[in-house]
Design a protein with these regions (language model features):
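Short alpha-helical segments that sit at the start of domains
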Residues: 1-16
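Short amphipathic alpha-helical interaction segments
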Residues: 6, 38-53
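Short, locally clustered residues in the helix-turn-helix/winged-helix DNA-binding domain
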Residues: 14-21, 84
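Minor-groove-contacting beta-hairpin "wing" of winged helix-turn-helix DNA-binding domains
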Residues: 64-72
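Short, amphipathic alpha-helical interaction segments positioned at domain boundaries
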Residues: 74-85
Length: 85
């Protein structure tokens, strides 16, 4: 994976990490993460697929696949603690 792609993925993780820190008991919507990470939904969805495949993020899509929620997995949370604290 090249550095540009990795930097983009870390940006999504950081945005999700910040959202989770601010609202720990509330699931993060795709719309909120798209806004916080400053990515169009189509780009965000592709990047989330890579993060899900890595085991760092869990994604739950609503019927139709347009809306949903995303959260850090245990390993994603551990990675976030290492990178962002």
């Amino acid at each position: 994976m090249d550095e540009e792609v990795m930097a983009a993925l870390v940006g999504v993780l950081e945005a999700l990490w910040r959202i989770n820190a601010e609202w720990p008991d509330k699931p993060c919507t795709l719309a909120k993460l798209s806004k916080q990470s400053e990515r169009p939904m189509s780009v965000l969805r592709r990047q989330l697929t890579m993060l899900v495949d890595a085991g760092w993020v869990a994604l739950a899509l609503e019927e139709g696949g347009v809306t949903g929620t995303v959260l850090l997995t245990e390993s994603g949370g551990q990675l976030g603690r290492e990178l962002f604290t």
